[in-house]
Every structure is written in C-alpha cells, then in structure tokens.
C-alpha cells in the first residue's frame, strides 16, 4: 500500500456514529460504512484509506501492533488496556465518568469535607469491567482491593453478594439509582481519543498530522 494510505480503526456501538460524523465533516467520505453491514473492512479509495470496525476494547491492540494506523477509542478503554500507542487528540464526544458505587444501605460515613470515608473499604471486593483502573485508584488512596472482572451487569454484583462495591462508567447515573447504588467516589472523566501506532506516526507523520489538525480545527481543540 502507498506510504500515506491510512487504516482507521473505529469502534462498534454507540461511538461509531459520532466517529463517522466527524470524519465526514473533515472530508473523508464514509457513507457506506455501517454497523448493519456484515463487512468489517470498508475501502475508501478517494481518501486513500480504509476503515475497519472493531470491538472497542480491541482497538488499542489493533493500533499497537500496526493492524491499524490510527483509531478512535474511549479513554476508559485506553486506560484499562494500557497499550503502547500515541494519544493524539481528545475528540470530546462519548463522555462518561468512572465512579465507585455501593448499595445505599452500606455507604460509609462522610468526612468533614463532605466526601465519603473510603478507609473502611480496604481489602474489599470490587466488581468491574476495569480492574486496572479500579486497582490504580485504590492504590492511590493507599488501599488494596480485590477486583472481580465481569463483562456486564456490574450493578448486580453487590445485590447477590459477589462484591461489596463496583467501579463502573456512568453517563447520567440512572442505572445506579435504579439498582439502589450510591456513588461514593469519582475516579475520572473519559471521552473518545484519537490514537496512533508509534511506527505509523513516524512513517506517515505528515498524513496523520494533517488529519489530526483537521479534527482539531473542527472540534475547536487547543493544540
């Protein structure tokens, strides 16, 4: 393939629509790309590129190993997967928050500053899709926890005795409230990021930088 040919990895699911929208707005025609299609690879001849559709959690791996030159991925996934990639730009969409939550009847007391006292949660079990993020957060608090990795229905874990608390991503908090869980600590905020393979970023620097700058101007991001 030509040196400036780009393979772009996009996530299946809710981030795909926003990702395609911003690419279209910077002149990359991708009308044929659809999650409804059985295809996973979409050639874009005019743009000298192709789009591949991946599971969100796999995108950092595709980019790290060079199967994709660049990718769109949530910061939550980027932190958890901890792959060796170049983070180029905060794209701003797909906002969510990492939080610690517990059943409302088991929340710890509050400290004078209004925050919940987490000290009594040392060595407790934490159900989460993000064990690395959970461990890192509690380690920063000087605590150890036992992460239990689940792939869905995280809110169920405290109700059936699998874990004392959860670490999960939330957008509005509605699911927590419906399951009688209370947010006891914020961890961090996450949005979608543009990432690049390290070798591709050197070899295709001009092309990748051009695309990054067009996205930056579109989204009004500071350099």
Curated annotation (Swiss-Prot):
Catalytic activity from the UniProt record = 1-(5-phospho-beta-D-ribosyl)-ATP + diphosphate = 5-phospho-alpha-D-ribose 1-diphosphate + ATP
Q: Which PROSITE patterns match?
A: ATP_P_PHORIBOSYLTR
The protein's location, in the record's own words, is: Cytoplasm
Biological or metabolic pathway of the protein: Amino-acid biosynthesis; L-histidine biosynthesis; L-histidine from 5-phospho-alpha-D-ribose 1-diphosphate: step 1/9
Q: Does the keyword Methyltransferase apply?
A: no
Q: Does the keyword Aminoacyl-tRNA synthetase apply?
A: no
**GO terms of molecular function:** ATP binding; ATP phosphoribosyltransferase activity
Subunit-structure text: Heteromultimer composed of HisG and HisZ subunits.
Q: What is known of its domains?
A: Lacks the C-terminal regulatory region which is replaced by HisZ.
Q: Which family does it belong to?
A: Belongs to the ATP phosphoribosyltransferase family. Short subfamily.
Record function comment = Catalyzes the condensation of ATP and 5-phosphoribose 1-diphosphate to form N'-(5'-phosphoribosyl)-ATP (PR-ATP). Has a crucial role in the pathway because the rate of histidine biosynthesis seems to be controlled primarily by regulation of HisG enzymatic activity.
What name does this protein carry?
ATP phosphoribosyltransferase
């Amino acid at each position: 393939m030509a040196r400036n040919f780009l393979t772009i990895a996009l996530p299946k699911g809710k981030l795909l629509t926003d990702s395609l929208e911003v690419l279209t707005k910077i002149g990359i025609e991708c009308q044929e790309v659809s999650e409804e299609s059985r295809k996973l690879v979409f050639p874009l001849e005019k743009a000298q590129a192709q789009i591949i559709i991946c599971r969100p959690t796999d995108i950092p791996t595709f980019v790290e190993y060079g199967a994709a030159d660049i990718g769109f991925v949530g910061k939550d996934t980027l932190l958890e997967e901890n792959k060796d990639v170049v983070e180029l730009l905060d794209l701003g969409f797909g906002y969510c928050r990492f939080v610690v939550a517990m059943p409302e009847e088991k929340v710890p007391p509050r400290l004078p500053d209004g925050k919940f006292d987490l000290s009594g949660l040392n060595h407790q079990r934490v159900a989460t899709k993000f064990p690395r993020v959970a461990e890192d957060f509690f380690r920063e608090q000087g605590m150890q926890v036992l992460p239990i990795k689940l792939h869905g229905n995280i809110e169920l874990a405290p109700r059936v005795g699998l874990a004392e608390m959860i670490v999960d991503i939330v957008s509005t908090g509605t699911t927590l409230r419906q399951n009688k869980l209370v947010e006891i600590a914020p961890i961090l905020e996450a949005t979608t990021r543009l990432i690049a393979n390290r070798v591709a970023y050197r070899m295709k620097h001009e092309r990748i930088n051009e695309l990054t700058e067009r996205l930056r101007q579109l989204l009004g991001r500071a350099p």
